[in-house]
From Swiss-Prot:
InterPro entries: Sig_transdc_resp-reg_C-effctor. To E.coli YkgK. This is Uncharacterized protein YqeH. It comes from the Bacteria. One of its GO terms (molecular function) is DNA binding. One of its GO terms (biological process) is regulation of DNA-templated transcription. It comes from Escherichia coli (strain K12).
Length: 210
């Protein structure tokens, strides 16, 4: 289906020029001596300001090799249940850091497990000191293998995707050729991992229009 155009803008924030990285690279980039870092989606203004003020300004002496900091919050749940976003960001060859809220931790861990382009996850309960240490380690070239908390399984991810897309449990059972009781059991496990009812999380998330 492809990524919605509203999410295709990716801008470098390493200096005041704010050169465009995607969808078309600014010609100025070839003359830039700064390593690049971006915040995405760009409509998350409070998130973007918080990352710059809370994390990146405290690590300005570290080596920036090019990173995208992703607002991995429930506001973008529907976006993160498709693979278009990670394929698009990974095409930049920059490292990807997920900054997860409380509800999205198990989904962030799922993507961390299944895509090597994701360098690290910063969790809601990490605190500024822990977050800064993770970023410092990344910026000096260390590999961070640790993930905290639960991780959605492939089947849980698939079933949640169907539910958020509007399928009811009976339709999902038919599509996946599973017993209806198994679907309800998966639904309970998903909601436990996500820390909330799927319907409530769906309501809190933005629509994804193509």
């Amino acid at each position: 289906m492809g990524l919605c155009s509203r999410y295709k803008s990716l801008t470098c924030n390493s200096c005041s020029m704010h050169c465009q990285i995607m969808p078309e690279e600014s010609p100025r980039l070839q003359y830039c001596a700064n390593s690049c870092f971006c915040m995405w989606p760009e409509e998350s203004s409070y998130f973007n300001r918080g990352v710059v003020e809370g994390i990146l300004t405290k690590n300005h002496n570290a080596r920036l090799s090019g990173y995208i900091f992703v607002d991995f919050s429930v506001s973008f749940l529907r976006l993160f249940l498709e693979k278009d976003w990670i394929d698009y960001l990974a095409s930049t060859d920059m490292g990807i850091v997920l900054v997860s809220d409380r509800n999205m931790q198990s989904l962030a861990n799922y993507w961390r497990k299944h895509n090597s382009a994701i360098s690290a996850v910063i969790y809601n309960d990490d605190g500024l000191d822990v977050a800064n240490e993770k970023i410092r380690q990344l910026f000096i070239g260390r590999y961070l293998s640790f993930t905290g908390g639960n991780t959605l399984t492939q089947m849980e991810f698939t079933i949640m995707g169907y539910m958020v897309s509007g399928y009811n449990p009976y339709q999902i059972a038919e599509v996946l050729d599973m017993d209806i009781r198994s679907i309800y059991a998966y639904k309970q496990r998903i909601e436990k991992r996500m820390g909330g009812k799927i319907n409530e999380l769906f309501i809190r998330s933005h629509s994804v229009q193509h």
